Amino acid sequence: DAVLGNEESAKYVTGIAFHGYENDGFDDFSGGLEYVTENYGKDVYITEITEYSASIDFASNISYSLQNVVINPLNYGLKAGTYWNFVLTSDGQPVLGNTAECYGVINLDLESDGWHYSKNASYYAMAHVSKFVYDIDGKDAVRLGTESSNTNIIATSFYRADGAVVVIVHNISDVSYEAVDVVIGDRQFTYEIQPQSVVTIVC
């Protein structure tokens, strides 16, 4: 409030970034994201949130990304989210000046027959949005209000300039399949989502 609530200083601010450290996530930032967007109309960003070596497997990692960088923050007006690093080795190297054991979006490893790359869970979490949500003829996609009555299901959706509606749905449960009823205006259909899985629907 000290900066954004002052008319003179606020005109020099285009956005506010919420920076993540160990164990930080969407729950730590949701109040701030909502407060800034609703009271000041400034862009909001999440920086350096990423899965790390304490995670169990690919499913838990993609779930972490979808909950903390992609779906939940987008519903709170997120302008952009960034990960810890774009390219690292599969064991999180190089580490400069700290002891973080974080993953890059891409792994790049030198093996006996040369360099090899692989994609981490965060790559696919981003791809569920970036592959389907884009501008058309200079017209940006518009985020739609999206609600879920199931606590295991989180979702966000966009209206594209070509008239398509893009819905990204994630089942956060690590044990149960969830049948999701998707309702868009007068259209409705049901889709069953596996545990800790994500689906992007274009209709």
Task: Please give the residue ranges for each predicted region.
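C-terminal beta-strand-rich structural cap/linker in extracellular carbohydrate-active enzymes
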Residues: 192-203
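Aromatic/acidic polysaccharide-binding cleft in carbohydrate-active enzymes
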Residues: 46-128, 143-146
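Composition- and surface-driven signal marking solvent-exposed, interaction-prone regions
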Residues: 30-32, 58-60, 140-141, 179-185, ...
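Active-site lining segments that contact anionic ligands and/or coordinate catalytic metals
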Residues: 13, 41, 78, 103, ...
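Carbohydrate-binding surface patches
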Residues: 132, 145-185, 196
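Noncatalytic carbohydrate-binding groove/subsite architecture in carbohydrate-active enzymes
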Residues: 1-69, 75-76
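Flexible loop/turn segments at secondary-structure boundaries
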Residues: 23-26, 52-56, 88-94, 174-177, ...
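Hydrophobic alpha-helix feature that most strongly marks membrane-spanning transmembrane helices
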Residues: 8, 41, 45, 74-75, ...
